[in-house]
Amino acid sequence: MLPYDTGKFHGIPVGADSISARHCKMCKYIGGKTMKSSNIPEVKLGIVAVSRDCFPIALSEKRRAAISAACAAKGTDLYECKTTVENEHDMQKAVAEVTAAGCNALTVFLGNFGPETPETLIAKHFDGPCMFVAAAEGDGDMINGRGDAYCGMLNCSYNLGMRHLKGYIPEYPVG
């Protein structure tokens, strides 16, 4: 008799050939004890900042670092991708970086306007859910008076739709 074929499925008597007995083998019912499992996925969240090349990249990087610091202060585990996306090459590098870090969910953060093609292609090339959010323009945190993240969010939304890509955009994505 195999260890998983105990005649009981989580304490309920069953036949040796029943689906429940076979299920015990799959859920690691070993030696009369069930290993605790959960159907809630373990999320390793990453954040990637994007910046249009005609805008100051430092603004996106500074805002991304502030979000990472705020998450760390609240005890939220967040991987901060050091590659800021301005073009398709940067997009591929950033996706490879977050994938190598083990991220399975991603926040694409528009620290300023953002490049529509590379930022939306992140959703295509990253193997996991992507949420798109943007920094508020009126937060006073601008470089040379530039911080057009709201307009970039509108373009991002439009381009995701045009490319038939799925990305999560919260009800209030700018803030």
Model-derived segments and spans:
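Intrinsic disorder/low-complexity segments
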Residues: 6-7
